């Protein structure tokens, strides 16, 4: 039987009259899609190698290149889409699991897009953030149920209650966990510098700690995952908080996977594994099989850090996310990270990324409600991740019950990512998801930091504008305030789970 050719996903069109044969597109394509024919004096493209990163299109000096989606026409079949056919063709040829990157791109509709916000008029005047103070600073960590104060003989009032360690965020947005290995050092440095500039935090991910990041300890969260790469007492004390990764929104129930192609000498040194070998994190932590085991690890980390840093637990948004989160809080977690089905990744089985988990909107709503019902909401902050696209999503997530959000894909887009979903190949032309020195130098961390910081500043301005329009002058007054939300086109049971009313219904 002849080998079936999988149709190319993208087609590169080149205007031969505009092309000056500078061969820039040939030199820069790390996938080898473009090539030059000396005899014909023309540049051609092997479309099957194109991943749709648009880098050649961006650097073409005469704008001669257009990269477009290939229209793979088949007999119209509602059940058998081109995606299904191409997937079967690939697996029939290779016998392997289909890998992919970034977040879930299935056409599940976003519940954030079905939720609208309130605005104040007449009886509850709005606030102008340009003329009146607006507080969007928030703190991540365990809060006390009540505060006690005492007065000295000289009349000085002091706080008697001992406050647990907190992370101070000047804007309620942090950069999510992306490890050294999955993305380049220049990409991490961009986010680290942006976090320091804006006054928020970035997360190292599970790949250990390169020495170049140690100067950012005041804005850094270190992560402990099942692979325990680079974990030591020194590592745990190198940041401002420690996060235990139990699950990830892009691949709940399975471990991490860094392909050997991306394990270069620096990655090998940081992760403490041989060069060129796959870095595999097991599905479970092999010392955590119960809430009691999780509690033991949480307090072991607290002991190692002298109880000076918040310890968080990251879980994927799954069907029983509420009791899992409640158990983690009772086990001693100072904050809970919930990663939704739209969460991104550097590498994951496509079948898992696309079909496992639940939307973050439902997850944060039910977790916040569960913690309130159990009377332990003050014991931990909630951070949500997985598909946060803009400042409106941030506001809606906080109103549903979050204290702050993580962004990953949005941050990478600010650095130049075009969502070609091939991070696992390690050939990112934009210098982000690669360890090839020829490619990583394409990303200038100073420029990247400025762009990422600009993104957060822009969102901060928009958050203040929306809060002012609601008549709210502090982000704390928004947290869990579902009265400012209304659902559009949602079923009754969906509204009930989200804890919001339908649009048109008053207070």
From Swiss-Prot:
GO molecular function ontology, one term from the record: 4 iron, 4 sulfur cluster binding
Residues that coordinate or bind [4Fe-4S] cluster 2: 29, 50, 53, 56
Record GO biological process: glutamate biosynthetic process
SUPFAM superfamilies for this protein: 4Fe-4S ferredoxins, FMN-linked oxidoreductases
Name of a matching Pfam family: Glu_synthase
PANTHER family, sorted: ARCHAEAL-TYPE GLUTAMATE SYNTHASE [NADPH] (PTHR43819:SF1)
Name of this protein: Archaeal-type glutamate synthase [NADPH]
């Amino acid at each position: 039987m002849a080998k079936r050719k999988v149709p190319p996903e993208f087609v590169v069109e080149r205007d031969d009259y505009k092309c000056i044969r500078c061969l820039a597109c040939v030199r820069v394509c790390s996938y080898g899609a473009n090539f030059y024919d000396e005899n014909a004096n023309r540049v051609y493209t092997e479309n099957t190698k194109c991943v749709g990163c648009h880098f050649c299109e961006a650097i073409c000096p005469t704008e001669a290149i257009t990269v477009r989606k290939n229209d793979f026409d088949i007999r119209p079949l509602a059940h058998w889409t081109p995606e299904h056919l191409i997937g079967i063709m690939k697996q029939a040829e290779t016998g392997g699991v289909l890998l992919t990157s970034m977040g879930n791109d299935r056409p599940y509709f976003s519940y954030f897009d079905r939720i609208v916000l309130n605005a104040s008029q007449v009886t509850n005047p709005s606030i102008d953030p340009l003329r009146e103070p607006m507080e969007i600073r928030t703190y991540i960590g365990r809060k006390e149920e009540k505060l006690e104060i005492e007065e000295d003989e000289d009349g000085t009032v002091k706080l008697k209650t001992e406050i647990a360690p907190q992370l101070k965020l000047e804007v309620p947005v942090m950069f999510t966990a992306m490890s050294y290995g999955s993305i380049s050092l220049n990409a991490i440095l961009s986010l680290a510098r942006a976090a320091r500039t804006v006054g928020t935090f970035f997360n190292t991910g599970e790949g250990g700690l390169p020495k170049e990041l140690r100067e950012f300890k005041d804005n850094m969260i270190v992560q402990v995952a099942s692979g325990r790469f680079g974990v030591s007492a020194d590592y745990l004390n190198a940041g401002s908080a420690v996060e235990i990764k139990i699950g990830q929104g892009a691949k709940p129930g399975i471990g991490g996977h860094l392909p050997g192609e991306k394990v270069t000498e620096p990655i090998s040194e940081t992760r403490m594994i041989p060069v060129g070998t796959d870095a595999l994190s097991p599905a479970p932590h092999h010392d955590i099989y119960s809430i009691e085991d999780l509690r033991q690890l949480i307090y072991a980390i607290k002991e190692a850090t002298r109880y000076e840093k918040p310890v968080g637990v990251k879980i994927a948004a799954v069907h029983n996310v509420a009791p899992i989160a409640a158990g983690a809080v009772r086990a001693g977690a100072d904050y809970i990270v919930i990663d939704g089905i739209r969460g991104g990744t550097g590498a994951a089985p496509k079948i898992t990324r696309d079909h496992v988990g639940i939307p973050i909107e439902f997850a944060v709503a039910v977790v916040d409600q569960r913690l309130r019902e159990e009377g332990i909401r003050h014991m931990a902050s909630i951070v949500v991740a997985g598909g946060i696209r803009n400042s409106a999503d941030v506001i809606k997530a906080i109103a549903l019950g979050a204290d702050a959000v993580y962004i990953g894909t949005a941050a990478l887009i600010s650095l130049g990512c075009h969502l070609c979903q091939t991070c696992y190949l390690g050939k990112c032309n934009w210098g982000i998801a690669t360890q090839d020195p020829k490619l990583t130098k394409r990303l200038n961390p100073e420029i990247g930091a400025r762009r990422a910081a600009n993104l957060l500043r822009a969102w901060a301005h928009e958050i203040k504008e929306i809060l002012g329009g609601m008549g709210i002058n502090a982000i704390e007054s928004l947290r869990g305030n579902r009265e400012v939300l209304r659902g559009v086109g949602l079923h009754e049971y969906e509204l009930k789970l989200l804890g919001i009313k339908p649009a048109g219904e008053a207070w």
